[in-house]
Swiss-Prot record:
Residues bound to substrate: 99, 115-117, 265-267
Name of the coding gene: hemF
Classification lineage: Bacteria, Pseudomonadati, Pseudomonadota, Betaproteobacteria, Burkholderiales
Protein name, per record: Oxygen-dependent coproporphyrinogen-III oxidase
Necessary cofactors: a divalent metal cation
Gene3D superfamilies: Coproporphyrinogen III oxidase, aerobic (3.40.1500.10)
Amino acid sequence: MTDSTYDVNRVRAYLQGLQMRIADALGAFDGTPLAADTWRRGPGERLRGGGCTRILEAGGFFERAGIGFSDVAGDALPPSASASRPQLAGRGFEALGVSLVLHPRNPYCPTVHMNVRMLIATKPGEAPVFWFGGGMDLTPIYGFEEDARHFHRTCRAALEPFGAELYPRFKKWCDDYFFLKHRNEARGIGGIFFDDFSELGFERSFEMLQSVGDAFLPSYLPIVERRRDTPYGERERAFQAYRRGRYVEFNLVFDRGTLFGLQSGGRTESILLSMPPTAGWRYDWHPDPGTPEARLQSEFLVPRDWA
């Protein structure tokens, strides 16, 4: 994080290309192209810059799919970005990244989240400080070991060229991060998560970021290809809404990206792109023992060595 030699133009070009590749692939899979919403911040707003949101709602397969690119700058890092680095509080910053969340309609197809980003903190008279962050995680409604192993093995393969220790380190980080403390339960089966990362220097750290971004489609599309035609009914949709409620709770209470966006004066529509189209809550409800719904909690929403 102290190496100030970096090339933000290369990072920007990669991220814009990644968004386009993923959006095209998702549109082809769904049968409906993702719409494009290009935006820029206006004069006098807290942030400068802009981005592009690719969005699909009520598609053939995806009930909601959003993938956003943003490149914004501000005069002071928000508290969520400088909490672990108080020495950077108050610095100017540039933040650029791609973030996506996909909510399939079929409850047997998992929700997925992926994010890759770069932040640069600046202060007049001092060298800029940069770091990378990101990862991907899977949130099944109904658990399948085959799917969990495929997802985690793809994540592990993406990180292996950069050090055998990275996957177990980033997996634990993900398990710890995507956890609803007030519920004492995991959001999903995890994946990988990293932040404040530049320890390999700019070139290798950027290569690692690209490897993670490039691994998204092969990590996810084979899973939903297997499950997309699985029959379901009202019971499964009701449980899906219940689990989506947990997703909403995490994103609004704990997620650093959501908090960063809201605290920095970000674009609300883009920040809340991760929200499911429907969600539900039931008072003190618990699935019956021995059901697939109970099995999700006992066998999948616990840290496991999936890879």
